[in-house]
């Protein structure tokens, strides 16, 4: 199994996600991140997902599309996605 692209921990009622890479530009990395993020929503791991982009310097437009889809998926089950 491939190494996770995310560092995930829980604080109170939220799942907090940090990213292992400061540059999220490669489509294979973005696809792996998407699978992991969507799995959090599909498993209903938390109603609130906080994405911490503090260590990210570069983000491809493909990754923005992933964030939009993640937000829609979360809202469809009554959840929310927060970005910091």
Which residues does each predicted region cover?
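Amphipathic alpha-helical interaction surfaces in cytosolic regulatory modules
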Residues: 23-84
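STAS-typified acidic loop motif
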Residues: 2-35
């Amino acid at each position: 199994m491939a190494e996770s692209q995310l560092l995930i921990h829980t604080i109170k009622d939220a799942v907090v996600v940090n990213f292992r890479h400061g540059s999220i530009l490669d489509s294979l990395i973005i696809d792996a991140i998407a699978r992991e993020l969507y799995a959090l929503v599909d498993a209903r791991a938390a109603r609130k997902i906080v994405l911490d982009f503090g260590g990210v310097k570069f983000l491809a437009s493909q990754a923005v599309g992933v964030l939009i889809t993640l937000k829609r998926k979360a809202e469809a089950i009554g959840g929310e996605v927060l970005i910091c």
